[in-house]
Amino acid sequence: MANDKLNISPLERAIDRLSEGWDRYQSDTSDAQILDGLIQRFEFTYEISHKLLKRHLEANSANPAEYDEMSFQDLIRSGNEQNLLLGTWTDWKRYRNMRSKTSHTYDENIANEVVSGIPEFLTETRHLLVQIKKRLA
């Protein structure tokens, strides 16, 4: 896969939507519908971000197939080694756990836990996007 064919627009849009949701939530933290939408936006931004990370690593590897067999933990470590990520494996494990919790049950405490991690996650995904854009330039 050529790096110039890497489509970053889904991540750009997802980050914009998550940021917009965060701003709306901040203006009214009591609105359950806004909270639900914010969590959903977190979920799809998380999915897009780690998939784009993998595609970028594959596109710049002499052996792209190695990333198909790589664990999520090693994928994050590879992203760190290439300065694509701010967070460590521990941070991304927390994001992954947040995503997992939201997809299996709905609980107000879990929702609040997920929401509390969104600002840090937004910083992380924005950094990933900037780093990939630099490499595409």
Stretch-by-stretch model annotation:
Residues 1-137:
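Solvent-exposed interaction patches of small proteins and small membrane subunits
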